[in-house]
Amino acid sequence: MWKTARDSVCLICRSAATTTTSTSARASLEPWAGQRTFSTRREQRPSRMVLSDRVARPPPVRGPGEGNKKPRNKPDGPWAGMNRRVANIDPRKAPKPKPVEEDSRRDKRDKNTKGQKALKMQRALATISYGQRTSIKERMQEIQAFDQFDLLPVVKEAIAQEALKGMTEIKPTPVQRLAIPALLGQPMGRKPRRPKSDNGREEFLLAAETGSGKTLAYLVPAVNAIKKGDADDELVASYNERLAAEKERRGGAPVSEWIEKFEPHPNTARPRVVVLVPTAELVDQVTSVAKKLAHYTKFKVRPLSASISPLRNQRNLYSPIGVDMIVSTPHLLATIAKSDPNVLSRVSHLVIDEADSLLDRSFSGDTTSIVDRAMPSLKQLILCSATIPRRLDTYMEEQFPYINRITTPNLHAIPRRVQLGVIDVSKDPYRNNKMLACADAIWSIGKEAAKHEGPKSEIDVKRIMVFVNERETTQQVADYLVSKGIDAIALHRDTEEHRKSEMLASFTSNEPMKISRPADDDVAAAAAEGGKAGGAVSSSPTRRHLPNTKVIVATDLASRGIDTLAVRYVVLYDVPHTTIDFIHRLGRAGRMNRRGRGIVLVGKDDRRDVVAEVKESMFMGQALV
């Protein structure tokens, strides 16, 4: 009878019952398996803290009738597999075909090697493939000079005479070779351009490493568009005729005396180019670069930021002589646009610099409101950043499906010309005293600078940046360094404006800084004494003064966008939380093909494996993930 009941059960049910029994038995024999798996589970990082692995890969081109909406994922029903002739497989997720033959043993070794394990455990992703990097390098070779761009002659002269004045060799950087012709609509290479959006607007992403010249890459096409627009604008042409007639009628009187009584310019409070940046320091920096071009090409650029008085901000925007370009922070411009919506009615070019920061939580509301108000008249939308997190990549795919992605070969990579050193603070002589280790590292740099082979009457002044993770730590570290005879200042949002601008001016200047050597050579003597005790023991503070160094202790406020050409040394007091912070902080050194050095202070609670893999990736020239 049991045999008859057993034969009445089909083979599939019998197999399922056997599998269930074996699984439950295995679970009872190995009760640790579930606990072990759960313990190794890690909390996922937010997408805004994770680098994107498909920066250079645009979304698939949709048909003419599909519009800009993202296709909705429909769940498969019970009969979804019936009457199909084509497999429902996403070609982007399809596995890549394996190579037929391995070229060498090195390929096999690289294939089996699991690199950057600690970085990948932090949910960071790989960058663009090396095949795409090679193709980008080939396209870059077609441009060797600014004369090859379709720019107006006056703009070309402004680049050579003002923007790059003093440089012995004037050549475009990699991002400028790729971005300027794309923004001008100049066909370069074999890569087809993405189609325009439904209203004829063009969207671009400029993703390039820190210190690569992105500011000039988006300013030059914008200035070229301003000058072309002046020639074609009938309102501006008629205003200039009336202004010339008024000058002749007044008989050579200064324009500044009567211009406010004359009719306002058509561009008064109606800029055609808007550049958004996250901080007031970046407003000043971008404005200074734009004014160099404006001095030669004759257009009007004005800054708007919280560091400027409200009365001056009002004059900059509502000046009777008009304004062509505005450089502002998002919150201030969004507030002005809310009270005066017509401010953004004539904007044709909108640039969002440091897009990964401006489209993050703190700035996204103001930034998106500005973009929405400028959309009706917008011709070009340009996003710029040195790091593209996954959150920003998803945002661009949903909001701007036709965006043209312009990436450089070294995206998400720290240049090899920047060397990284690691100091283990947990060992002797520091014994977990990071402040002591930081002061000792700065004294060592000052001691090396005092031994240079230049004139004996002068010594070089080294400008050093120290980065911390917490704003409260900046003042503590700065006070400790000052007590050890080091000229240091804390840079954060509460720092006085005049002191902040004074220190930043010395760090962004391209000119070398030198001081006269003391007669008794007390710098070397003090450095030698400081080196004996790790720069910690001294009873006379005047004897241990280090005059040939200037130090800024800052948070990420100074790690984004500021063009610190004079900085050669960067000290990471705290280990950065993500590779994005590594890229921006170490990117303050080694800018514009200059050498630099980074020093990381690693304590007992820091991730040593992450620091080791970042150092190895920098040595190998690999992109961080």
From Swiss-Prot:
ATP binds at A208, E209, T210, G211, S212, G213, K214, T215. It catalyses: ATP + H2O = ADP + phosphate + H(+). Disulfide bonds: none annotated. One of its GO terms (molecular function) is ATP hydrolysis activity. Residues 19-28 have a biased composition (Low complexity). Transmembrane segments: none annotated. CDD domains: DEADc_MRH4, SF2_C_DEAD. Residues 90-113 have a biased composition (Basic and acidic residues). Keywords: ATP-binding, Helicase, Hydrolase, Mitochondrion, Nucleotide-binding, RNA-binding, Transit peptide. It is an enzyme of class 3 (hydrolase). It comes from the Eukaryota. Residues 195-406 form the Helicase ATP-binding domain. Its EC number is 3.6.4.13. It is found in: Mitochondrion. ATP-binding RNA helicase involved in mitochondrial RNA metabolism. Required for maintenance of mitochondrial DNA. Belongs to the DEAD box helicase family. MRH4 subfamily. PANTHER family: DEAD-BOX ATP-DEPENDENT RNA HELICASE 50. The Q motif is unique to and characteristic of the DEAD box family of RNA helicases and controls ATP binding and hydrolysis. This is ATP-dependent RNA helicase mrh4, mitochondrial.
